[in-house]
Swiss-Prot record:
One of the early assembly proteins it binds 23S rRNA. One of the proteins that surrounds the polypeptide exit tunnel on the outside of the ribosome. Forms the main docking site for trigger factor binding to the ribosome. The lineage of its organism: Bacteria, Pseudomonadati, Chlorobiota, Chlorobiia, Chlorobiales. Gene3D superfamilies: 3.30.70.330. PANTHER family: 60S RIBOSOMAL PROTEIN L23A (PTHR11620). It comes from the Bacteria. InterPro entries: Nucleotide-bd_a/b_plait_sf, Ribosomal_uL23-like, Ribosomal_uL23/eL15/eS24_sf. One of its GO terms (cellular component) is ribonucleoprotein complex. This is Large ribosomal subunit protein uL23. It comes from Chlorobium chlorochromatii (strain CaD3). NCBIfam families: PRK05738.2-4. Belongs to the universal ribosomal protein uL23 family. The keyword Ribosomal protein applies.
Length: 103
C-alpha cells in the first residue's frame, strides 16, 4: 500500500486540539486502517502514537446547469484521522520532523 498520510488538516479546531490535547488531525487515504496510520506516523516522524481515531466522509453530489442540460458530478470520499501522541512529543508539519520537549 502507498503512504496512507496525505496532508495535515489545518483548521481552527484542529489547531486547538494540537495546542490543548496534543492531538494532530491528518487527511489520510480512505482505504487506510488505524494500524497502518499508526505505523506510518511512527516511522515518518519518529514519535510514539497513543491512539488513532478515524472518521469517514462521503463525497457530496454536485450539479452544474449548462446549455446542454444538467451535469451531475461527485466529490471524492475522504478520511480524517485524529492522532494522539505520547506526553511531551509533538510533530512539526512543515519540516516533517518530530520534537520532544524537555521538562
Amino acid at each position: 500500500m502507498a503512504n496512507p498520510l496525505l496532508c495535515p488538516l489545518l483548521t481552527e479546531k484542529s489547531t486547538g486540539l494540537t495546542e490543548k490535547k496534543g492531538q494532530y488531525v491528518l487527511v489520510v487515504r480512505p482505504d487506510a486502517d488505524k494500524l497502518t496510520i499508526k505505523d506510518a506516523i511512527e516511522k515518518k516522524f519518529g514519535v510514539s502514537v497513543t491512539s488513532v481515531r478515524t472518521i469517514n466522509y462521503l463525497g457530496k453530489l454536485r450539479a452544474q446547469n449548462t446549455r446542454r442540460g444538467r451535469i451531475i458530478g461527485k466529490k471524492s470520499d475522504w478520511k480524517k484521522a485524529i492522532v494522539t501522541l505520547a506526553e511531551g512529543q509533538s510533530i512539526d508539519y512543515y519540516s516533517g520532523t518530530a520534537q520532544k520537549s524537555e521538562g
